[in-house]
């Protein structure tokens, strides 16, 4: 099956897409994850870790396709795959920044004993 390694919630959402679109979406998701993980070797995300961010990205792309269709522009998943890639990468960067802030907050928080002044 095309989506067997994908988390359940993401798989359920993706089942609404045409098979050809699924192939494109799967390729873009895996490329985005690989690209992100290779740039941030200190943090390695699995699909399960980034499922919500991928869903947000897919919904954003679906809305963009719809909005452009209303304006008379014919867009497809194939024509929007660059937008999908950049949207997923943006969501992952946002998640990474939040994770780094959380780590640093606990590490350098003077109220939890994280900072030693001696």
Language model: regions and residue ranges:
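Electrostatic interaction modules used in gene-expression and signaling proteins
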Residues: 1-118
């Amino acid at each position: 099956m095309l989506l067997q390694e994908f988390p359940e919630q993401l798989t359920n959402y993706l089942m609404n897409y045409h098979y050809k679109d699924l192939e494109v979406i799967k390729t873009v998701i895996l490329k985005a994850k690989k690209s992100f993980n290779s740039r941030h070797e200190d943090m390695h995300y699995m699909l399960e870790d980034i499922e919500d961010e991928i869903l947000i990205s897919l919904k954003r792309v679906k809305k963009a396709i719809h909005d452009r269709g209303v304006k008379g522009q014919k867009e497809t998943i194939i024509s929007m795959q660059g937008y999908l890639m950049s949207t997923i990468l943006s969501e992952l960067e946002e998640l990474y920044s939040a994770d780094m802030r959380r780590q640093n907050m606990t590490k350098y928080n003077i109220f939890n004993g994280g900072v030693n002044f001696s």
